[in-house]
Amino acid sequence: GHGFRKALKRVWPKAKLQRCTFHAFLQVKRCTTGRPKTIAGIEMYMIAKDLLMIKDMEQAGHWVTRLINWRIKHKTFLSEMTRDEKGKIRPMHERLLKAERSLARLVRQNTLFTYLDESLSYGEELPSTNNRIEGGINAQLRTMLRNHRGMPLKDA
């Protein structure tokens, strides 16, 4: 969240942040489901899924253009309103709007395509996901904690 971003700026002011593209995709999938029913939902899901295939800045630029064009194309659909059970007027396609906003925010913050910045790579390709840490270090920590469930912290 915001706490991490503040801490990163304080400790490493010049560090660049990369949002895991897989987790960005999952955020959209949570909002649209894996089988969206509307055309706008299907297209948003595909845009998010295609995020996982981007290999260079040119592809990233095309992807951002698709995201912007999606918003323009579905503007009328996305502006539809409904009244909830408490009588409050809300966007009818709230979850779809949330999905789009999550991606647009990452684009604005420049945290979606940091892995494509050649000045950071030192000849080695940077990962677009955090699979290495999730499957490596974090998995070992989770296993250790699971095996020692109930162990008092003072003994750890």
Predicted regions span which residues?
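Conserved beta-strand -> loop -> alpha-helix junction used to position metal-binding or nucleic-acid-contacting
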Residues: G1-H2, K6-A48
